[in-house]
């Protein structure tokens, strides 16, 4: 089985280690590569997949929207998310899906039943994929650009707020989807008033524990790192390609170990 992740740049990707571990554990012979592709190389890659050279692709930045033109169809998750992170074959056709949102929701299930209020921080592609996958519409969007928050909220029939009006004590689950925190110093919002046992998730996994998660933990929250979404979406992709449900616990330990090195 020949699998790969396509992006640019891609050297930082931990997907090969994760998926090759799952291939070995499942008794499947195969490989998973990281392909640093320029835009002009994309047509040949998808042509090769049609010809049987590849069994599946993950797609990452900056190609999640671009690859749509090379596919035969998108499933509902990809259509709603407006982006593709996984390509698989069915009856010779190339199908695009998006497992980011569903992967995160699945990873959060041990912590919440989603019966309370959910706050989504950010209004970009990641936020869109997560909102469409949530099993609730009791959702509030907050974003630095209010117009984008309103547009996303209107798309999914949820509400939006501003950082000035927001009260974090209202929410049972907070999901941070922006890049704020990658610098290991910044935090996207104030957690003043955060209730104990609130579930706080940051989809960033470098650093493993962001400044926001550090503060949330100090306030008694249940924190979930970006590894949860990374492994969750990867598991759903792996299952699409192989029909095998991989061990996410083992995958999570592997990735956390690599990030802590």
UniProtKB/Swiss-Prot annotation:
One of its GO terms (molecular function) is shikimate 3-dehydrogenase (NADP+) activity. The keyword Ligase does not apply. The keyword NADP applies. It catalyses: shikimate + NADP(+) = 3-dehydroshikimate + NADPH + H(+). It comes from the Bacteria. The active site is at residue 64. GO terms for biological process: amino acid biosynthetic process; aromatic amino acid family biosynthetic process; chorismate biosynthetic process; shikimate metabolic process. SUPFAM superfamilies: Aminoacid dehydrogenase-like, N-terminal domain (SSF53223), NAD(P)-binding Rossmann-fold domains (SSF51735). Its EC number is 1.1.1.25. Shikimate binds at residues 13-15, 60, 85, 100, 205. Belongs to the shikimate dehydrogenase family. Homodimer. NCBIfam families: aroE. This is Shikimate dehydrogenase (NADP(+)).
